[in-house]
């Protein structure tokens, strides 16, 4: 069982002259820390480095009983990336509220990202009670992690844009690329693209007389 596996790891570490086979944490405590990490929150085992803008381990040699350090490290690396992406997108949303007076395309992108974060948080909170193993935690975060990673990818490019037109063009280009890479999220990403372009399209419609004039057009 798990204890026999742990004993074998200790024996092998001693035989190789290693000081430790890893510190064993309680399953429940460590699993909860992984869940918090995936959602972009610091915990007993993981913390956010504000200077580097990434999540890091508090201790490098923590594992759970029955699992070797190399095996658990692979999952931890994935979760560190998920948490870093989630924190980055959430910070962007908080810094660019949906009712901001800035660029309209940036505002609508922020609103779409906020809705996705809220939905994913609800899904993970609802399903986390059934995640009682490392494999289940990995499965729980696989698609949410990919989706938040896609948003972070779009965000990296959007932050370099200076106008609504540049933002819209960037989002559509990124969405087309990401939909080829992750076919399952196509409908979600296209919805994001539509949300980003909608204010600009309404402005164009008003400009050509297809709908009532907007305050923005009247001011001009």
What do the predicted segments below correspond to?
Residues 1-220:
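Soluble, amphipathic alpha-helical scaffold/repeat regions
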């Amino acid at each position: 069982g798990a204890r026999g596996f742990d004993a074998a790891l200790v024996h092998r570490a001693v035989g190789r002259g290693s000081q430790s086979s890893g510190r064993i944490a309680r399953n429940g405590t460590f699993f909860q820390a992984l869940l918090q990490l995936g959602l972009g929150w610091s915990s007993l085992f993981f913390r956010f480095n504000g200077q580097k803008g990434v999540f890091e381990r508090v201790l490098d040699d923590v594992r759970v009983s029955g699992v070797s350090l190399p095996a658990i490290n692979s999952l931890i690396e994935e979760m560190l990336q998920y948490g870093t992406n989630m924190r980055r997108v959430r910070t962007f949303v908080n810094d660019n509220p949906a009712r901001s007076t800035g660029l309209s395309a940036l505002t609508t992108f922020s609103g779409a990202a906020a809705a996705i974060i809220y939905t994913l948080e609800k899904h993970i909170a609802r399903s986390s009670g059934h995640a009682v193993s490392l494999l289940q935690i990995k499965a729980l975060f696989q698609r949410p992690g990919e989706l938040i990673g896609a948003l972070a990818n779009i965000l990296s490019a959007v932050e370099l844009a200076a106008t609504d037109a540049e933002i819209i063009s960037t989002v559509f280009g990124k969405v087309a690329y990401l939909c080829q890479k992750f076919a399952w999220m196509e409908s979600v990403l296209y919805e994001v693209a539509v949300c980003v372009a909608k204010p600009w399209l309404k402005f164009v419609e008003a400009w050509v007389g297809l709908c009532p004039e907007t305050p923005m057009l009247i001011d001009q």
